[in-house]
Amino acid sequence: MMNRRARDWGLDCTHFASSHGLEDGNRSCARDLAVLTRLAMAEPRIRRIVRRRQVDFRFPIKGHRLYLYGHNPLIRMGYPGAIGLKTGYTFAAGRCFVGVVRRGGRTLGVVLLNSRDPAKHAPKLLDAAFARL
């Protein structure tokens, strides 16, 4: 089903071997991840989730809490206008990051694949892109 949906969306270099993406056989490219990002950010529920630095849940047993922390470097560093999205890592793909920033009525995204330092590279690319607008 996921692969059929990917084709429907025009994600020509994307193939899913699993829903979690951690095993061999999953693949994509920067263009497809950019398209998928645009589709995801059109969903209000997704936007609310990916902009958070952390989320905590209360467990019904003994009132304990579970804290989940996001790893989005733009959100963590307080990059101006950062509104989401997602980091990822596998041995095959290396460090990957997709980020979205809204500033001055414009929304830009950055896709980094196999990046040595997404926290360094993403802001530089976005700064350069916003400077050209």
Task: Describe every region a protein language model picked out.
Residues 1-133:
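Penicillin-recognizing serine hydrolase domain
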